[in-house]
């Protein structure tokens, strides 16, 4: 009996994972909300604050975004509005001024599963100026004895604070499950890891 329960649990976990992996990723209007706060000393060079352009890059695969973030020539072309790879679904640019706050409502493109944030600090964005975020998935189950699962991509809210020399805060959460907040911490390989607060 216990063995049967254990294999049922394993099957349920596998089914849930398959549903998440194969979730549909349709276009969704204003499904990405980006709250940006720029500190007064934004993008300081020789103690002089200046503007900073933020890229919001959408792609289906995280690997596509990691390739872009580790390729200075491609990043530069994205800042100039040219040269996006076929795997890049959408690029939005917004220039922040020191001491300002703004909220952007960005459409999520069809097939988007991952979003990269790149802040254009002087002289060029480095690892501490980038973040990779996976679009959250909301799971629903129905049935008592035999559960069936359905999944959909959730709208996401990203809170971003731009400090003097790097991103000083980045967190995100789904509007479907507001109690699930994730913070991003810089690591040495160019990605920001996500962990629950």
Language-model features and meaning:
Residues 43-47, 105-107:
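Short histidine-centered beta-strand/loop micro-motifs
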Residues 2-24:
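Bacterial Sec signal peptide processing site at the extreme N-terminus
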Residues 28-32:
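Short structural boundary motif marking the start of a folded domain
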Residues 59-129:
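Mid-length scaffold segments of soluble, non-membrane domains
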Residues 34-45:
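Short amphipathic, basic-aromatic surface patches that mediate peripheral association
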Residues 46-55:
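Short coil-to-beta strand junction motifs in C2/discoidin
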